[in-house]
């Protein structure tokens, strides 16, 4: 639990409110300060060896910040507020530093807590998310940050459903067309993806295709392959198709 002496100490000009995230528990707090914003120290509770303090610094013209508790294995804090504000969040050792940067048009760079590796997310206008999933050790899962919806200023932490229990997959770039070799492919599937429960396919053949419901749609890759790109359907077997020796994930 947080020490009584380490509770948030807000400047006299700051007013504690009940903004986004504050209703999730006593670990959340919403603070609104007039320009120029001051640096706040917020006490959050987390299981060992997670720290109990998160230091949050935000810049002008930010006026409202919301402290949001993120998923296990570390209960840390993100700050949500409108662009073009930037956030610098530091978790003392052994947790790693997390940087969240949201300039227009919704581009994000995130470093996940140990033992997770980095996750890079780029959300070009109009805020379409492209995610690279990364390796994580148990009980950690790969994280990503979802781009804000239209008209929304919030961002939040969620886990990759294909990552549990902390398997490995790699970023897959779209292949070039007209017979040119792809830039990169999925080179390792997340665990248990051959069941199709996570939108992944293995040894699927002509009747198996990666879709939102798993393996089961027909996509014209021929008798020995499966379309597996998600956003660009292939009409013939090519770099986006899976064979019996391939594993792919949409």
From Swiss-Prot:
Please name the source species: Homo sapiens
UniProt-listed InterPro entries: KPLCE
Which tissues and organs express this gene's product?
Skin-specific.
Protein known as: Protein KPLCE
GO biological process terms, alphabetically, are: epidermis development
